[in-house]
Amino acid sequence: MAKGKDARIPVLLECTACVRNGVNKESTGISRYITQKNRHNTPNRLELLKFCPYCYKHTIHGEIKK
């Protein structure tokens, strides 16, 4: 039997500090994490505090479109 739309969807989290600063000159790249969220419990965009290896500190990572 087929189910309806799944409640859990994969999302990409991207460092907001790297995007705003245009990435450090020493390192190229933007920190991204893949996680899941429940569409019914969190309908708005997800923001989590994660470690960014390019900024060398914990920064806010926000949900982006695929």
UniProtKB/Swiss-Prot annotation:
> Which UniProt keyword terms apply here?
Chloroplast, Plastid, Ribonucleoprotein, Ribosomal protein
Which cysteines are disulphide-bonded? none
Q: Name one Pfam family in it.
A: Ribosomal_L33
One Gene Ontology biological process: translation
GO molecular function per UniProt = structural constituent of ribosome
Q: Which GO terms describe its cellular component?
A: chloroplast; ribonucleoprotein complex; ribosome
Give the primary localization class.
plastid
Q: Which residues form the signal peptide?
A: none
Please tell me whether the keyword Plastid is annotated for this protein. yes
Entry-linked NCBIfam families: PRK00504.1, PRK00595.1, rpmG_bact
Q: Which PANTHER family would you find in this protein's record?
A: 50S RIBOSOMAL PROTEIN L33, CHLOROPLASTIC, LARGE RIBOSOMAL SUBUNIT PROTEIN BL33C
Name of the protein in its database record: Large ribosomal subunit protein bL33c
Provenance organism: Helianthus annuus (Common sunflower)
